Amino acid sequence: MRLLLIALVPLFLCSCGGYELKNLVKSDIDLVTDQFITKTREDVSELVVMLYKRNPEQLAKNPGMTIEGRLAQLKVHRYRLQFLELEYNQGTDAMNLAFSPSFTGDRVFALVVGLGSMLRQAYAYQPEMFLPDQLEAEVLLTSAQNVEMLVWKLKNTR
């Protein structure tokens, strides 16, 4: 009887609306982190659209490229964002390309690849978190400070 009950509990939990079996191996913090990861990726996508609408000449540096194409490039790489056109730079290195006077490529793409890869690194390149996963507070703090500096640079650089 006890074995039958153990076998049926996951079945009943899975039949509950919105509950996924994988959530059995997630803490409350993991669920909150998953929501934050999803939200930051959505925000970066919105930023891509906004920056390309304000700077269409950057998108035009790659003939035939569209905003949707750039978004697809960011989404197809689930973990590390590495692109030849940015010489495989990530994080702050890619973001600094966007502000470098000698860089002739797509500055918007460099900026969002840098931002996106930095945020992914902060979450240990995990698209979602589970019980054994751990976040490093120092890496999260550094990425938050880098985002603050990026916002300042965007406001004060023309």
Predicted regions and their residues:
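C-terminal motif of bacterial Sec signal peptides marking the signal peptidase cleavage site
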Residues: 12-15
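Mature extracytoplasmic/lumenal regions of exported proteins
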Residues: 91-158
